[in-house]
Amino acid sequence: MNRKRKKIIGLGLLLLLAPSAGYAQGYSCGNVGLFCSPDTLRGAQLGAFSSVVYRQMRGLSLAGVINSVGGDMRGVQISGVSNVVKGGNGVQLSLFNNVSSSPFRGVQLSALSNVSMGMKRGLQIASANVSSSYMRGLQVGGYNYADTLNGSQIGILNVCVSHPRGVQIGVINYSRDTVAHK
């Protein structure tokens, strides 16, 4: 079987103005630039405006505006505005919002909102936290929502559809589950 192996690119210093001009196919162990966009990252990346990884990220990604990982992420995303990931394990830290389009395990910390399509085990802290599907962990914020809550919600308004385990602590707590312990 003839498989084409990806090569390690190494450290890239990209001070290009076009985002697509900074694209590097293969593994990158480090990037620094205005717009960083390797195929796969195993290491650290610092993008002044954006830090985009098209497939997998293992490591640290820092961006002034937005971080985006098109595949699985294991590591830390820190940005000034927003972090977006398909799914993974680790920490997302931003001023405005964090988004995971599939189940996430770890910590999402933001001033405005955290959204995930499920939290395997984790912590969401923001003004508004949404865990579509299930939440196994803790949500702390003004508004907390989970489809299935196996954990705790601490906030002003806490909402869940099903509440098999855990506790809701807040001014208004709502659960459609009639057997939930409130």
Where are these regions (language model features)?
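Bacterial N-terminal signal peptides that target proteins for export
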Residues: 2-10
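N-terminal signal peptide c-region/cleavage motif recognized by signal peptidases
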Residues: 18-21
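Surface-exposed, glycine- and small/polar-enriched segments that build interaction surfaces at terminal
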Residues: 23-182
